[in-house]
A protein has these predicted regions:
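Conserved AAA+/SF3 P-loop NTPase catalytic/coupling segment centered on the Walker-B
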Residues: 1-9, 33-43, 57-58
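C-terminal engagement/docking regions of AAA+ P-loop ATPases
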Residues: 146-191
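A short helix-turn-beta junction within AAA+ P-loop NTPase domains corresponding to the substrate/partner-engaging
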Residues: 41-73
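Short, flexible/disordered intra-domain loops and linkers
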Residues: 1, 39-48, 75-82
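Conserved Walker
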Residues: 11-26, 47-53
Length: 191
């Protein structure tokens, strides 16, 4: 029952508890530790997780995977002193940007992909690309506000890589996905 609830939420943003349906518009991030020996996207990184997370049906609903081992471990040199951005202020801005559909519209206009591309792969890549656009280029209000090369390097390519890790992991537990790649996205010519 928990599996179906989680899959439903991840797919449609709805949760059914008893006879009551609730709609949510929040996403969520799952955090976890992977044994250091398995920190390799070309190995099955999910095998030690609970069985709920080792099904391709649930994994396919995960948009992307951030390789935490590429993020530097916190150390004294990373701490700041003096002026800083207040995290509550930053969180408020991110919350406001969540409702701004301009960024997704820009992504939809900028990218093209094969007509037969997998819907979940396409949606995951577009959502992650939109998130990168909001985070890294919050000033962008139209396609002309960002260079295609920057959009590709900092938004689209990282999003495709994050989704490809999920697809690769699914291929290790379900033959249906073995050797599958995410769709090729191209940036429309608009300059």
């Amino acid at each position: 029952e928990m599996t179906q609830t989680l899959q439903g939420y991840m797919e449609q943003g709805t949760v059914k508890i008893g006879d009551k349906d609730d709609v949510a518009d929040a996403g969520f991030v799952m955090l976890g530790n992977i044994d250091e020996a398995k920190m390799d996207e070309y190995q099955n990184m999910f095998e030690d997780l609970p069985s709920l997370f080792r099904t391709s049906a649930l994994m396919d609903r995960i948009h992307g995977f951030i390789k935490g081992w590429d993020i530097p471990r916190m150390n004294e040199g990373l701490k700041i002193s003096g002026w800083a951005l207040n995290s509550e202020y930053f969180s408020s801005i991110m919350h406001l940007l969540r409702d701004d559909i301009t960024y997704r519209a820009i992504v939809d206009r900028m990218v093209e992909y094969p007509a037969n591309a997998d819907t979940r792969d396409t949606e995951a890549i577009k959502r992650i690309t939109t998130a990168y656009l909001k985070l890294l280029f919050p000033h962008v209000r139209s396609m002309q506000d960002i260079k295609p090369s920057e959009f590709n390097a900092y938004c689209l390519t990282p999003a495709r890589k994050m989704r490809q890790i999920i697809v690769r992991q699914m291929g290790m537990i379900d033959l249906q996905y073995k050797g599958k790649n995410v769709p090729t996205f191209l940036i429309r010519d608009y300059e």
